[in-house]
Amino acid sequence: WNVIALDLPGHGRSEGPALESIEAMASWTIEIIDTLGLNSIALIGHSMGSLITLETASRLSDRVTHAVLIGSISPMPVSEPILDATANKPGAAHSMLTSFGFSKQNLMGGNPNPGMWMVSDSMRRYEDEAQSALDSDMRACNAYQRGLEAASEIAAPTLMLHGDADRLTPLRATKPLLDALSNARMDIIPGSGHSLMVEDPNHVLDQLKIHLL
């Protein structure tokens, strides 16, 4: 596989203003895919990225060979306290999203990756992101209502990965999305919260290999 890890506009090393809707983010993603001339792709997205994956895969049809949705529910409502914090109190927003982004067990410490502290790494990543981009992202997730319709249009084999201790997108809320997908499999990671890729990276990698290879 050749891997392309995208930084959306206004994020990471990508310049420009942040896009304000999941639909716009999907359109931008498709522009990148078209520019690169890719006709056989697997799409993988976490949280907001999973909504972008849904919307993108529904539009690209049979160009998508596989899809992976990590920590995904649809709709994906964002609470008013978080929206208020991302707009007006960035420090509080970083703390809230970090606190709720991990299982209670993993917040206490420990890391399968030696030499790393999950909680501190999460805080640094939020602090490095522009406040306006984080606020725009949260509002885009909250506003996106086409997820189940998009899911029903996806024929590609789809893997849903979810932590059983996810407090941002609770496991109990995954059923509508799972039911809307015609060719889906759910894998539940014990003891993980919303930040699966750092809470249990080996499990996530193993499931990606099973699904994609």
Regions found by a protein language model. Give the residues of each.
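Active-site loop/oxyanion-hole signature of alpha/beta-hydrolase fold enzymes
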Residues: W1-I44, M48, D206
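Conserved alpha/beta-hydrolase catalytic His-Asp/Glu region
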Residues: D84-E153
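Conserved catalytic-core motifs of eukaryotic protein kinase domains, centered on the activation segment
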Residues: S14-L19, V78-E80, L171-R172
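Alpha/beta-hydrolase active-site loop signature
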Residues: L8-G12, S74, G193-L196
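Catalytic active-site module of serine/aspartate enzymes centered on a nucleophile-bearing elbow/loop
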Residues: A184-L213
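Flexible "cap/lid" loop of the alpha/beta hydrolase fold
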Residues: L51-L97
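Short alpha-helix in the alpha/beta-hydrolase fold that links the catalytic acid
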Residues: A156, P170-D179
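Short beta-strand/loop motif that positions the catalytic acidic residue
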Residues: I154, M160-H162, D166
